Amino acid sequence: MEEIDDLGGLSKGKSFASMSKKDSDTLMIVDALNLSFRYKHFGQRDFAQDYLKLVQSLAQSYKAGQVIIACDKGSSSYRKSIYPDYKQNRKDKFETQTQEEKEAFEAFFQDFEQALLVVADYYPVLRYDGVEADDIAAWLVANKEYKHCWLISSDKDWDLLISEKVSRFSYVTRKEITIDTWPYECTRDNYLGLKCLQGDSGDNIFGVDGIGPKRAIQLLDSYDDILSLIDVLPIPGKQKFIQNLNASADLLELNLKLMDLVTYCDDAIGEENIKDMKEKLKC
């Protein structure tokens, strides 16, 4: 995987419109809140101008003619409607913070809001109540025209969108994930199935007890994909993990609805918000 070393900003006042027209077929989608956590990590305040310079620098590095800022605004209303405990663990953790930690987090979010205001003068910012950036990115990947798309996020969930035309850059690892540098032992097509079987502890999504990465990949290889596996349940076997799997058809179907960004992004964003996105982006 290629490493990116230079994340310096462009000179002050340089506008995105001045970039070469020859690069206009490259789309860059920025996971806005995710990218801002670099400043929280270093305890940096008043980072709005630095944030803008960082986005401009990334756009220059990837010769992006189109840049779109995708931003969370609360947890997904769609996911909570089908699974009320979605991300409940994060809420519980927040409630145990000290007063000092809460004040620091609130200060960070104030700075982040200011950064969004600054960056909005240069690029379209897509942000809607109860909609997550993952779903906005999935919709853009499916509906925008581009020669190649770069996703700027350290969130591995975005790897569900990787294809010949879509790649990801992580500012945390400073590495690129592409179809040619696919880092997982499963195939790209079975990455969703792997996630469904294992769950996602960060989002409070449970997997099948006793099924780790190796068993999950073996199952997906044997039955082609997660949908085919669900269709044939129950499968023969006396092992405990097989019994758990056979009892988990409903769980796996729920996990698909929670994790399949490509299939359910329209549901997660909502008709009115999609209409607004189309108007803003003229697509």
Q: What are these model-derived regions, one by one?
A:
Residues M1, L281-K282:
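Disordered, low-complexity tails and leader-like regions
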Residues E2-A115:
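Domain-level signal for Mg2+-assisted phosphodiester chemistry and nucleotide/NA-binding surfaces
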Residues A247, I274-L281:
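Charged, low-complexity intrinsically disordered segments
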